[in-house]
Amino acid sequence: MKMSIVIILLLFTCLIATNGASGTKCSGSPECVKFCRTKGCRNGKCMNRSCKCYLCS
């Protein structure tokens, strides 16, 4: 019983972490550059229809 609660909590934590890590939806990298610069990052790329920001301070 305790093990199943631990597994459920672990899955719930993973779902929250992946949801917070995802960027905005995109169709091309130029959209992400503007979005990432507003967040304080130097560059951004569109990967799997989601913005990924790089070189953040």
Swiss-Prot record:
The residue range of the signal peptide is 1-23
Per the UniProt record, the site (Aromatic residue of the functional dyad) maps to Y54
Family matches, as PROSITE patterns: SCORP_SHORT_TOXIN
Q: Where in the cell is it found?
A: Secreted
Tissues/organs with expression: Expressed by the venom gland.
In chain numbering, the residues marked as site (Basic residue of the functional dyad) are: K45
Q: Name one GO molecular function term.
A: ion channel inhibitor activity
| Entry-linked InterPro entries | Scorpion_toxin-like_sf (IPR036574), Scorpion_toxinS_K_inh (IPR001947)
Disulfide pattern: C26-C46, C32-C51, C36-C53, C41-C56
Q: Which UniProt keywords apply?
A: Disulfide bond, Ion channel impairing toxin, Neurotoxin, Potassium channel impairing toxin, Secreted, Signal, Toxin
The record ties this protein, via Pfam families, to: Toxin_2
Q: In chain numbering, where does the site feature Key residue for immunosuppressive and anti-inflammatory activities fall?
A: K45
One cellular component term (GO) for this entry is: extracellular region
Summarize the protein's role. This toxin shows both immunosuppressive and anti-inflammatory activities. It has the potential to inhibit human T cell activation, since it reduces IL-2 secretion and the expression of T cell activation marker CD69 and acts as an anti-inflammatory agent, since it provokes the reduction of secretion of both IFN-gamma and TNF-alpha. In vivo, the delayed-type hypersensitivity response in rat autoimmune disease model is ameliorated in the presence of this toxin. Acts by blocking Kv1.3/KCNA3 potassium channels of T-lymphocytes.
Q: Which family does it belong to?
A: Belongs to the short scorpion toxin superfamily. Potassium channel inhibitor family. Alpha-KTx 23 subfamily.
* Extra information: Negative results: recombinant toxin does not cause hemolysis in human erythrocytes.
Entry comment, domain topic: Has the structural arrangement of an alpha-helix connected to antiparallel beta-sheets by disulfide bonds (CS-alpha/beta).
Protein's UniProt name: Potassium channel toxin alpha-KTx 23.3
What species is given as this protein's source? Scorpiops tibetanus (Scorpion)
